[in-house]
Amino acid sequence: MIDRKLLLQDFDKVALSLKKRNNAMDDELERLREVITHYKKRLIELEGLQAFQNKVSKEFGIKMAQKVDTSDLKKELENNKIKLNELSKSVGELEQQIDLKLSIIPNLVDEKTPLGTNEEDNIEIKKILTPRVFTFKPKEHFELAQQNGWIDFESGVKLAKSRFSVIRGFGAKIYRALIHLMLDFNEKNGFEIIYTPALVNEKMLFGTGQLPKFKEDVFKIENENLYLIPTAEVTLTNLYNDTIISVENLPIKMTAHTPCFRSEAGSAGKDTRGMIRQHQFDKVELVAITHPKESDVMQEHMLESASEILKALELPHRFVQLCSGDLGFSASNTIDIEVWLPGQNCYREISSVSNTRDFQARRAKIRFKENQKNQLAHTLNGSSLAVGRTMVALMENHQQADGSIHIPKALEKYL
């Protein structure tokens, strides 16, 4: 969440940030500011009543010791206690209103993030590796997968519904090999390998920003306070939920391979064929918790770590700076890595590395202690990489004229 103090002290800054996202919430912000102002007034009243209660209680004790009549003081204490209880309840209700309203306001846009409306305004930073020139028309991955018997889309629909797949045979071996390669590269770059639950409670999804605003995008277990994770960002980040970390232990660098589950609400008609957009997919995630001064450097490190894997797999890719209108809810700054897909003749996102600054840390109460003072940490997350999309890129970039797939040398030892 954004800092409630900032909203009171610099309302225009928050409003401008939302406009940069093309998400003007002026009315909601104004109502929130009114609630916070009212809350502060009531809090001052409450503190005054508490001070008065303490003062009268001391007088009551002194008079009791002196065996002086205390009936008037006793009545005053009782009346004041009723007012205190009523005011405490009012303050508590206002706090809940504030937290609920703050929880649906997205992160402030970083100064480095360029202005823009949508993905058309994103800026290419650099390209890595030159796309191969084919002597034949390259096929799309779903054609190659079916030809080689690696992916069974029909069985995925039979077992579940559309946007599910079954990977089998040598395709399954490649899929497993990619996961092992990704984890090995991430570990080499200093990220601790962690396996986490694929189910989390509501508090964890609130901590990383999926709830309450994006409830329709996650799968909930019926009659349980449990949800299937949309990304290991949720579990890795929330390992430190409500935790104070010693500054000497920063940065904390983690990686995890997990299945991910997304309802893909609002994606009807997009990427209906193949493995680009699935309800269930595997991803190897990077998460870092850092000192605020180090988060920009960490973002670069995470990008290079993901890029290193793509270079090893001989997959052309590029870095793209997301504009303000294309940022995710929790992100302050995001750089995507897009991989070249010759079958589609375009670049597609395969990793998204985001710096959330202290936005998630404030929601999840992730702090560090420095010089005897507790401060909010910065959190970052990014794919390294989306396994299915990496397999898609592998098939399309390394296809041969007969439909067979060349295996890059870096992957051979894992097969």
Swiss-Prot record:
Q: Does the keyword Nucleotide-binding apply?
A: yes
TM region positions: none
List the GO molecular function terms. ATP binding; serine-tRNA ligase activity
A single Gene Ontology CC annotation of this entry is: cytoplasm
Residues reported in the UniProt entry to bind L-serine: T231, A232, E233, E285, S383
Catalysed reaction(s) here are: tRNA(Ser) + L-serine + ATP = L-seryl-tRNA(Ser) + AMP + diphosphate + H(+); tRNA(Sec) + L-serine + ATP = L-seryl-tRNA(Sec) + AMP + diphosphate + H(+)
What's an example GO BP annotation here? seryl-tRNA aminoacylation
Family, similarity comment:
Belongs to the class-II aminoacyl-tRNA synthetase family. Type-1 seryl-tRNA synthetase subfamily.
* Quaternary structure (record): Homodimer. The tRNA molecule binds across the dimer.
Q: What is this protein called?
A: Serine--tRNA ligase
Q: Which organism is it from?
A: Helicobacter pylori (strain ATCC 700392 / 26695) (Campylobacter pylori)
Upper taxonomic lineage: Bacteria, Pseudomonadati, Campylobacterota, Epsilonproteobacteria, Campylobacterales
Q: What's the encoding gene here? A: serS
